[in-house]
């Protein structure tokens, strides 16, 4: 697969050849679905909790005597059917939301996501980001040159590049990640995927 490499002025500087086994595979919807569900489930904290009737304060005394009042018999004002009472079968914090996915399935989902972006021409390869200092204005100018301004964009660099991160952090809809943290959800959640040439080669080296 041949792709153009652009500079930050939006000009083509060369063409690179990418491995079809990574960037041009038939998308596998089930693998993508399973991987995204697993990734999102792993983010859940599982901290929600409700109190049972045993944990709610008060309610030890019988509200009224068993017989003779004409009312229905009651044993506690903290029974589940009372306002302010305990909750029956409520959520507890010991729930494990983890969903495991086979390594090969995750790899297939990753390659499928990259292939979708490439086939839709939403993958942009740049030679490098050459910032002398953090500059939001300069990053906006670069995005206009690459014709990706006003679009939800994921920028991938080989390493954590502080100047790129700081330059893009105040731009709405732009997220920056190092190649090692690239994931299926973020790829598909963005409209445009922008990668440095080094980052693209690093990703290909892992999944080819």
Curated annotation (Swiss-Prot):
Residue pairs linked by disulfide bridges in the UniProt entry: none
InterPro entries, per database record: Ribosomal_uL4, Ribosomal_uL4-like, Ribosomal_uL4_dom_sf
Region feature (Disordered): 44-85
GO terms under biological process: translation
Biased composition (Basic residues): 59-70
Pfam family, one: Ribosomal_L4
A GO CC annotation given for this chain: ribosome
Database matches in SUPFAM superfamilies: Ribosomal protein L4 (SSF52166)
Keywords tagged on the record: Ribonucleoprotein, Ribosomal protein, RNA-binding, rRNA-binding
GO molecular function: rRNA binding; structural constituent of ribosome
Classification via PANTHER family: 50S RIBOSOMAL PROTEIN L4 (PTHR10746), LARGE RIBOSOMAL SUBUNIT PROTEIN UL4M (PTHR10746:SF6)
Family to which the UniProt record says this protein belongs: Belongs to the universal ribosomal protein uL4 family.
Subunit-level organization: Part of the 50S ribosomal subunit.
Function recorded in the entry: One of the primary rRNA binding proteins, this protein initially binds near the 5'-end of the 23S rRNA. It is important during the early stages of 50S assembly. It makes multiple contacts with different domains of the 23S rRNA in the assembled 50S subunit and ribosome. Forms part of the polypeptide exit tunnel.
Name this protein carries in UniProt: Large ribosomal subunit protein uL4
């Amino acid at each position: 697969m041949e792709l153009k490499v652009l500079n930050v002025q939006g000009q083509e500087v060369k063409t690179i050849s990418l491995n079809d086994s990574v960037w041009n595979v038939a998308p596998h919807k089930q693998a993508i679905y399973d991987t995204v569900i697993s990734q999102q489930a792993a983010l859940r904290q599982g901290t929600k909790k409700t109190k049972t009737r045993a944990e709610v304060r008060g309610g030890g005394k019988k509200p009224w005597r068993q017989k003779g009042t004409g009312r229905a018999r009651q044993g506690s004002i903290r029974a589940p059917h009372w306002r302010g009472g305990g909750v029956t079968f409520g959520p507890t914090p010991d729930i494990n939301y983890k969903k495991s996915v086979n390594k090969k399935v995750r790899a297939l989902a990753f390659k499928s996501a990259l292939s979708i972006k490439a086939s839709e021409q939403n993958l942009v390869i740049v030679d490098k980001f050459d910032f002398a200092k953090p500059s939001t204005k300069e990053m906006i100018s670069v995005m206009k040159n690459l014709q990706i301004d006003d679009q939800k964009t994921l920028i991938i660099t080989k390493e954590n590049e502080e100047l790129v991160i700081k330059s893009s952090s105040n731009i709405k809809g732009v997220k920056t990640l190092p190649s090692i943290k690239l994931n299926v959800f973020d790829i598909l959640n963005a409209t445009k995927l922008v990668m440095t040439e080094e980052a693209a080669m690093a990703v290909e080296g892992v999944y080819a």
